[in-house]
Amino acid sequence: PCPSCVPNNVLGRANMTTASRKSIAICGACGCDKIVIHPCFSGDPTAPLDPEEEWNINIDFYSSFIPTLKASGVKCCLENMFITDKKGKSYGAICSDITETCRYIDTLNEIAGETLFGFCLDTGHLLMAGHDITFAIQKLGERLIALHVHDNDGYHDDHNAPYLGGIQNWNRFFLGLRAIGYKGDMNMETGNAVGRVPDALIPSTLRLLADTANYFRDVVLADETV
């Protein structure tokens, strides 16, 4: 579900928590070993949550999934978020601060008593927050277990194909993944790249996305220096 948490709505939070638990169980039943659940944050740049309150809400929120994660054999990924003000300016929101993100994951795994939590890095969200992708990946290290790969113009969450937006230097992405020995999936979160073309071009657009993902994989796993 999205949003996965409604911080100031008790009933909404309860409903989303229940839906997330069901989603975890469905993942397990389908043989999918990871799920991405967005963290809780205000979404209103004029009324952000107090940092301590935001921390406590999220620790409680994610901790509540531990029994279901264990029973389902699924790991839960947090994701870096962004926020946009009324003038269209984007800022990093919860989990854009990678140091804070590492603290979240390490704390939750300590509570769980095993490694049940990791991170999904969203390349488009990171661009909108103005953060360096190599630093983020290297700081996350083995905590990084999933990717949402897409591009945008730096202002809108376009979910466009790589090389069609503002991420001009994808080599920074490759360098980070190679540095940590990333072997996970190369998940292209690029629905808008398909949704914006005529039906006749959908097959070729899908081939382009598949070719791009395969190219990214090959570069990351190659022996030569990027």
Positions of the model-derived regions?
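Histidine-acidic metal/acid-base catalytic patches
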Residues: 17, 21-25, 31-33, 49, ...
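Short, contiguous, pocket-lining structural segments
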Residues: 54-57, 93-97
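Structural motif corresponding to the early beta-alpha repeats
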Residues: 1-60, 191-193
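Active-site-proximal beta-alpha loop/turn segments in soluble metabolic enzymes
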Residues: 40-51, 78-93, 196-197
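Active-site-proximal loop/turn and secondary-structure-junction residues that shape catalytic pockets
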Residues: 2-4, 39-43, 80-84, 123-125, ...
